[in-house]
Amino acid sequence: MTLQPAATKIDADAIRAEFEILTSETVQTGESTDAAPTASNKLPFPVLSDKALFGLAGYVVRKIEPHTEADNAALLIQFLAGFGSLIGKTAYFEVGADKHFTKLNAVIVGASSRARKGTSWSEIERLLIRVDETFRECIQNGLSSGEGLIYHVRDEQTAKKPIKTKGIITEYQDEIVDAGAAEKRAFVIEPEFARVLQSMKREGNTLSSVIRQAWDTDRLRVMTKNPVKATEAHVSIVGHITEIELIRNLDETESANGFANRFNWICARRSKYLPDGGNLAESDLNEAVRCLNEAVQFARNTERIKRDDEANQLWHQVYKRLSDGYGGLLGSVTSRATAQVIRLACLYALLDCSDIIRLEHLEAALAVWQYCEDSAKYIFGVSSGDKVADEIFTALQSSEAGLSKTEISNHFNRNRTAKEIEAALQTLLELNRIEKVEEKTQGRPREVFKVSANEKDEINEISISESQNTGLNSLNSSNSSSNKGN
């Protein structure tokens, strides 16, 4: 006799309730919002302006988007960085004595491992390799030391070999001991960027220093007894990390020493649910491959890039805001805004087969930077980089009436000096987190500090003549319309 399992009654309501809990993040038109603001981060998730999806870059993202759960911003920044690496050390924009080549670093930050950060690279990689099969050998991972990074793009190494005559050394001759790397392009994709940050904490590790060198110049070297060096290096790095891992592993040293501001920080989340995966055929990308081939050939035959008059006018209008930036931790990670925007604009121009940065190229670059800046605010914005300032801000959040300096001192049980409190308040004022208000009294006005009603976003407050609805004001409008559509 065969025993049959007892029939199990399916509780559809219970299953539905459990599913709603698991997918409690708002889902609209098949989209997911993995990265809902946490208790410590009340800023809205960044919105990518349509301005950023200009030209070939936008065409590629829109072609891939229906077939992936990846975030459009992650697709876009990796396409731009990959293109800039693929073309090599050719086109550049000159600022004084400095040349900005098309090297772009980025870190894609997901609220969790479900943000589909890794998925965002696979389709971009497939497209780039179709254009240049040799680029496959340029793609590296496993960053752990500065010497290791240099080794991949190292120069030829020689040693002095003694020449003897009748047993006596009469001269020395250079002998090649290492032919070096013929390929000077390196595109480092790090799906576990937390490991990179952990490696940099080891005593004597040179990775942070070399990464900074690689962004600044084409000459890489470390001061060791038997140094390996590289010239003409063209290195770009893209990392993937979760927000928790980033906050845990990016210490104050790396934020302050210029490591963090050589990266574009990109918030990413799952864009949609595709239970059966995507279905992007090779033929779907044929037109993108053709256009990208043209852009690559053009870029490899281009040297100096310039701005036209219209783009230059907009650049003059946004330059002060980009240069001034922010204070505190947010300022530390976004302080190379001008250089990042220049490189982004160059990439949009080259993708358009132009050696002139036109208005639309600069607008696209500014839209990407706006997203990077908003991402940095979302990730780092609640921390000023000053523990005293952070505690004061928390105290002010709990006091609608605000607090005077005396009350703030009492909050610390007078364990903080007036100088420390003054410096912390100044940091919060610079970040526009708080405002200073004078309240009338019978005698001397009372100075009170309160949380700002609205966070100031100077990048969208730049005054542009009423007759010219361009630049960051129009980018802000585009963002607003995008928000309405979502």
Roles of regions detected by a PLM:
Residues 3, 10-486:
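Phosphate-handling catalytic cores of nucleic-acid transaction enzymes
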